[in-house]
Amino acid sequence: KESPAKKFQRQHMDPDSSSSNSSNYCNLMMSRRNMTQGRCKPVNTFVHESLADVQAVCSQINVNCKNGQTNCYQSNSTMHITDCRQTGSSKYPNCAYKASQEQKHIIVACEGNPPVPVHFDASV
């Protein structure tokens, strides 16, 4: 079974490409990373930084998660990200997305020892 840390990497890590405004990027990546199976995942963020840099966020600024848990961490610096949002008119199985390219701080939930990101909470 996929571990929470591996799931985070599959859903959110794309260090090898730069952030993209192309809806093609989102349509391709959402499908390739298995987020359009059974349903369209409505919103997803890809982070275009090294895994080491994203894992390091777990020792940066401790903040509350949206759900009230206290194991979220905000990055010290901004990161290149692409937000993929499902378009209003698209329906499963033809999931369609629009992309927005951002440079923002990311907030992730971390677990484990050593702590690693297991959930993408927000970008600010």
Swiss-Prot record:
Per UniProt, subunit arrangement is: Monomer. Interacts with and forms tight 1:1 complexes with RNH1. Dimerization of two such complexes may occur. Interaction with RNH1 inhibits this protein.
Q: List the disulfide bonds.
A: C26-C84, C40-C95, C58-C110, C65-C72
- State the active site: H12 (proton acceptor), H119 (proton donor)
**Which biological process, per GO, is one annotated for this protein?**
defense response to Gram-positive bacterium
Q: What is the enzyme's main class?
A: lyase
Homology family: Belongs to the pancreatic ribonuclease family.
Gene for this chain:
RNASE1
Known catalytic reactions: an [RNA] containing cytidine + H2O = an [RNA]-3'-cytidine-3'-phosphate + a 5'-hydroxy-ribonucleotide-3'-[RNA]; an [RNA] containing uridine + H2O = an [RNA]-3'-uridine-3'-phosphate + a 5'-hydroxy-ribonucleotide-3'-[RNA]
- Family annotation (SMART domains): RNAse_Pc (SM00092)
Identification of the protein by name = Ribonuclease pancreatic
Q: Which InterPro entries match?
A: RNaseA, RNaseA-like_dom_sf, RNaseA_AS, RNaseA_domain
